[in-house]
Amino acid sequence: MSTLKEVQDNITLHEQQLVTARQKLKDAERAVELDPDDVNKSTLQSRRAAVSALETKLGELKRELADLIAAQKLASKPVDPTGIEPDDHLKEKSSLRYGNVLDVNSIDLEEPSGQTADWKSIGLYILSFALPIILKALYMLSTRGRQTIKENKGTRIRFKDDSSYEEVNGIRKPRHLYVSMPTAQSTMKADEITPGRFRTIACGLFPAQVKARNIISPVMGVIGFSFFVKDWMERIDDFLAARCPFLPEQKDPRDAALATNRAYFITRQLQVDESKVSDIEDLIADARAESATIFADIATPHSVWVFACAPDRCPPTALYVAGMPELGAFFAILQDMRNTIMASKSVGTSEEKLKKKSAFYQSYLRRTQSMGIQLDQKIIILYMSHWGREAVNHFHLGDDMDPELRELAQTLVDIKVREISNQEPLKL
């Protein structure tokens, strides 16, 4: 390991070399200005590379020097025979050893991790773009979301399309749509758009357009979303007209409508109206002015399509429509149910099976309630009792091969593998 003097001498030497290299770089830049031939350009590039390498090395040496000085200070500090740090408040040594020092200087308490998004500014930003680039980005982050996120994790990507541009001095320049691809350690700003936030706001603003283009996330596809929405108006009308077990039965047949799910939803709408937040109301008003397909009743042809791309919470534009946040929770439960079925039928230890289970519902519930509204669990129960069995019967469980066909194919595989090798055949 280098001594303190060696590192200091190294720093002095590199600083001298850097001064010389920078002077040579300036000379090369002047030479290119006077005669921009290939030789001068090549010399300029090599001079830049040399300066960059020296700056990098100098930075490393300075960090090494700082570490050595810190280590010397630590070594010279008197060690308490009790093993307790000088600023520790304990009178007796803890059974736990001292761990890492966590530096929190970089954390901004005004914008903590996991905060509620600024939906108004996010919504207005998205509304400022042409519809084609929004729908194409939605397709890339839902239908092809897994691949896009995997390839770009930890970066801030830009979507580009001919439909999105701005004119500067009469010249068209591309206007990019920015989306951040965070890692688990990333801290997102309130107005920063992540894939989850983008799917949430885009589906909430343009459900009719999502329906017209049949953009469905694979996560929703495997729980039979396409089948579920096929006769949506007929399905929701039958549901709203059904008898509600949470309302008292009416003695007069003429008042039967007062004991239906529709009557319960009307009461729920009055409760929701009292929970409205001004920012989201402003966003809804602006969205209507910008021709977004906003709806005020769950019994609308495109209402269910706000969940087509598996948003991680109820879109803010549908938050104040009775039954909509609960419908998203119903879909989240279906995702958990399917994953539980898949985990149950898989081979492995109980711990391995538990890892394959999911918590979509808990995540959805937490994120939606952070927007200022409490979900009505009774409505989720109504959805599950009316549509649960049918939905489960239309899950895609990834095992569509007939058992006899599988057995026959496996036999042929076994025979061929034994003919050409002495290895054990794999299972189909």
From Swiss-Prot:
GO terms for cellular component: host cell Golgi apparatus; host cell perinuclear region of cytoplasm; ribonucleoprotein complex; viral nucleocapsid. Residues 188-191 are annotated as: Interaction with host UBE2I/UBC9. Residues 80-248 are annotated as: Interaction with glycoprotein N. The N-terminus is required for chaperone activity and, in trimeric form, this region likely serves in high affinity vRNA panhandle recognition. The N-terminus also contains a coiled coil region, which probably participates in but is insufficient to initiate N trimerization. The YxxL motif is indispensable for the interaction with host MAP1LC3B. The central region is involved in specific RNA-binding. Has distinct cap- and RNA-binding sites so it can bind simultaneously both the vRNA and mRNA cap. Changing I415A: Loss of homomultimerization. InterPro entries: Hanta_nucleocap. The lineage of its organism: Viruses, Riboviria, Orthornavirae, Negarnaviricota, Polyploviricotina. Transmembrane segments: none annotated. Residues 150-175 are annotated as: Interaction with host RPS19. Gene3D superfamilies: 1.20.58.90. One of its GO terms (biological process) is regulation of translation. Residues 4-71 form a coiled coil. Residues 1-50 are annotated as: RdRP binding. It is found in: Virion; Host cytoplasm, Host perinuclear region; Host Golgi apparatus, Host cis-Golgi network. The record marks D88, D103 as: Important for the endonuclease activity. Encapsidates the genome protecting it from nucleases. The encapsidated genomic RNA is termed the nucleocapsid (NC) and serves as template for transcription and replication. The nucleocapsid has a left-handed helical structure. As a trimer, specifically binds and acts as a chaperone to unwind the panhandle structure formed by the viral RNA (vRNA) termini. Involved in the transcription and replication initiation of vRNA by mediating primer annealing. Plays a role in cap snatching by sequestering capped RNAs in P bodies for use by the viral RdRp during transcription initiation. Residues 372-428 are annotated as: Interaction with host DAXX. GO terms for molecular function: endonuclease activity; RNA binding. Residues 1-175 are annotated as: Viral panhandle binding. Residues 175-217 are annotated as: Viral RNA-binding. This is Nucleoprotein.
